[in-house]
Every structure is written in structure tokens, then in C-alpha cells.
Amino acid sequence: MIKELQGGNMATKFKTDEEMRGDRLTQCLDDIMRASTEMMVQQQLKTIQLNSDVAAGFRKALSKSLGDRVRAFHSILDGVETTLTTASQYLDAVEEAAVKMKQWKQQQEEEQRRKHQAELEKNKRQQEHDAATKAAAAQQLMAQQSPVDLTAPTPTGLASNLDKSNRVGGVKPFSAEFGHLDEMDLSMFGGIDGHGDFSLEDFNMGGNSVPLNGGRPRNMVMADAGGFPARGGMGRGGATAINNGAQEIKTSTNEASTNNRNNDGTGGASNPRISSNYNSAVADHESIGLRVDANGQNTKQSGQQSGAGLNPDDYLTLNDFNDLGIDWNTGENNELDLNDFNI
């Protein structure tokens, strides 16, 4: 065993300086092991006393050298710990810097992506706006070039239904709203006999307005027993055109009763309705007060002047008709039956 230790000690001595200077920690450990080995050898030699020249125990110098080696080893360990701590702190700082750098890069990428997205949205909105502007301009141009539709619905009142068009259904004539006013009996108007404030002369009826028959003046004969002619009457023309549809009223004295012919071509001589109302027609004419002189001119009774004694309050207006409470839409074919009214 001693030989092995001595052989190891000898082998240690043969180490080169370059190998010894390779690592301080390794060198320190080798020194500690060598000093410890020498001390153990000295103690064994003292114990077994193989040689009387061997000093008892290990020497002080050897003990001091071993202590120095141990302190150096501890110093190296402290340095290693400090180095490791510094390295750990450095690694933490590097890691933190790397994390911050990564976060900064992510923020930069996010900002770049956000800017790119905003730019894309801006371009998209601009394109949509341009497209809408072009479409509006094209629509306006088409509207200006297209013809105007004059058949659009036109409401006629505030309460009209806008969904309905005025093109649906025909427009009623004026006579349909108020009945056939041209078929009314002239006897319904008071003061028309020429003595009152309302006479036929005020309508400027000439000599041709009242035909003659054998020199005897006649009024426009009413065809209906109730006072309504079959066609014609008072109406458009201010009560002067009694014969509706006739182009002119004949004034021949040799002609039979041809006044107020109907559209079917029947004359007064063969029309029982006209014949039956002849006397009443003459009486109406005489009551009106028209006279025919030798020259065929209509005159009024003596003492009466045209338009004399007229009272504006006696004129009939639409309000007077409305006061009668007449339903103008009753009857067949918009014909009004005045027999129900005591006029």
C-alpha cells in the first residue's frame, strides 16, 4: 500500500507544468490530495516505527501547506459560486431583454398589421364611395335622358289613397255629378214669366230662340208629363238651348209642331207627349211674357224694360240647389226625379 502511495506520489511529480496550469480548481484539488497523502504516510510511519529516523507525526510545514490548499479550494469554490450567480443574473437579464425584444417585435408587427388593415379599409371605403358616386351620376343621367311619365298617380285630396291611381276608372263628366241639369223644367224657377226680376230676356234670347207656328208664339215644349223633356232643356247655354242636339231651331210658320224633337226623329205632330203638353207649353210661354211682333222679334210686355227691377238676391246659385238637399247621384243613368220635391 505504501508503495502504491509512493508510486502515485511519484507519478504526480512527473506531471508537466502545462498540465498543472490547466485548471486552478483541479490544481488545488491535486495539491490537497498530495499534502493529505504525505501526512497520512508520515502518521503511518510513526505508528509502525519502521525507521527510527522518521520524525514522529507530520511536520508543521506540511500541515500549513495543507491548510493553505484547503483555503484556496474554498476560495475557488466561492469564486465559482459568484461566477455562477453572475452568469445566472446575466442569463436572466438576457432572457428579459429577449422577452422585451420579442414583445417589441410583436407590437411592431401588430402596429404594421393594423396600419395595413386600416389602409385596406380606407381603400375599400374609397372604392365603395367612388362606385356609389358613379352609380348615382349614371342614375341621374338616365333619369334626365328618360322621358317623363305623365301617367303617374296624382292624388286629388289630402285623404286620397296614394296606392290607387287616377288612371283606374273613367272620370265622370260634370253632368254626371249634378245630374242632367239640361233636362230640368223651366217652371221650377220663379219669376221667369217676365213680370218678376228673372226673365228669359236676361238670357239674351233672340227671335230665333222661340219658333212660330201659324203666327202663334209657342214655348219650348216639354216632353215629359212631369216637366222633363226627353232630351234638351235648361243646361249648357244658360237655359237658351232647349232642344238638345239640334243645330238650329226652325221658325217656319207653316211647319207643324216640330219644336223640341227627340233624337229618334219623332215630330211634334206624331208625338203624343208633345201634343199632350202643347197647351201647357203655350201657357208657359204666355206666362213668361214673351211676345213676337210683326217682324218676328221677341218683345216684352209694355212697361217692362230689359233688366229693370232685377234683384241680385233672386238669382239662383249653386248654394240654392244645395239647400234643396237633392242627391244628384240617385236615379237611373244619373237622372234626377224632382217629382218628390214641391217646387
UniProtKB/Swiss-Prot annotation:
Segments of skewed composition (Basic and acidic residues): 107-132
InterPro entries per record: Mediator_Med2_fun (IPR021017)
Keyword check for Glycosyltransferase: no
Biased composition (Polar residues): 252-264
Region ranges (Disordered): 105-141, 252-277
Subunit architecture: Component of the Mediator complex.
Protein name, UniProt field: Mediator of RNA polymerase II transcription subunit 2
Gene (UniProt): MED2
